[in-house]
Amino acid sequence: MEKQVQISDSTINYEVFHRNIKYPRMEFKTGRLLLILPDNYKDYNDIVEKHKDWIYRQSSKIAKALEEAQNKRLELRRTDEEFKKLLYSFVEDISYELKININSIYFRRMKSKWGSCSRNKNLTINTILKYLPDNLIEYVIFHEMIHLIERKHNDHFWKIIANRFDNYKEIETELFEYWLLIQERMKPIQSEGNMYNNLPQVTR
């Protein structure tokens, strides 16, 4: 069910979903507000009203990020083979640096992550990472492989990240902007005969 709410100078679209959950929650997915309610919960207007300041702040943040994203360029000409070669090179270098071995690398469409790394040392890469600049691909791989040292995003984790990427906060912001850019520009694009067909709706 699609709705709208007017907050200050912004008209914000949102969707209401009912699920088998205990408590209501709100989340933004690539610029769109989702209101997820328990099956028997009806008063969604009350929740929106109570959290309108938070909704406005998040919506403004996303709008600003999307504006910044318009100046960025996607690597549309990079082939699957070129992407894999680059990625394997980064994995090899980072493995040597961290003294960590990766067992397997998988590629698949992921709706909410750039990648993941399991306790079994399996690295899963979101196929849309192909369209990012080299330095961001390297950062994502390093970020995921650090989870073999520290599973949580705690102070220890970010200290390790900062030792190699002292500007990691700016990089994280840039990655968020690329999420939005891909959502806006890449969803309609399909290239026949490769594993990047039917790009997912990117979420963050």
Give residue spans per PLM region:
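Active-site-proximal or metal-binding-adjacent scaffold patches in catalytic folds
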Residues: 1-139, 148-204
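Walker B catalytic acidic pair
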Residues: 144
